[in-house]
Amino acid sequence: MSKEAIEMIRKMDMEQVENQFVLQCAPLIAGLKMSNLFIIRKNHLRRLCALLQNSGIRCRVLYLDGDKLTVLLYNPAMLAIYMRNKRVTTILMENGYEQFDLESILLEFGRRYRSYRTENKSFPHELGLLLGYPIDDVEGFITVSYTHLTLPTT
């Protein structure tokens, strides 16, 4: 990246949701990724929704923490196709999901994510599937619990 481009980015007002969106979600906007996790101030949600109108990208609020929202931005067509992958469905089934249409998956994931944030429940590693991470990586994170890892002693 050129020095000019870097300087231009540094001068951008990162409090503006439009700038955050373009910089953090460029692969999603370009159709190269199916989803993106995005954290914004609560008072920016309306501007984000207006920005997404007619874009083909949807927004789902996962969690409110003070004045910050954690949202999942996603291309519904791309994500629905991916979530129908047999290995993805198997992982979800093994982790207690009962319905496998995109809306049901997103509702259940949202519930689990909120439980993780508010009730100290285990982290819902299926987030990796929703973000398009390699299936083998997601399976590995689900299978290997951090409680089984030990640090070397010196």
Model-derived segments and their meaning:
Residues 123-146:
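Hydrophobic/aromatic-rich, well-ordered segments within soluble, folded domains that form packed cores
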Residues 147-153:
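Conserved small/polar residues in nucleotide/adenosyl-binding loops
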Residues 33-35, 67-69, 124-126:
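Short, surface-exposed beta-edge/turn micro-motifs
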Residues 39-42, 73-75:
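Short beta-strand-to-loop capping motifs
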Residues 101-120:
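Helix-hairpin-helix/helix-loop-helix acidic hairpins
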Residues 47-101:
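A glycine-rich, hydrophobic loop/mini-helix early in the fold
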Residues 1-40:
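Short, extreme N-terminal leader segments that mark the start of a protein/domain
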Residues 22-31, 59-64, 114-118:
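Short, flexible, solvent-exposed loop/turn segments with mixed acidic/basic and small polar residues
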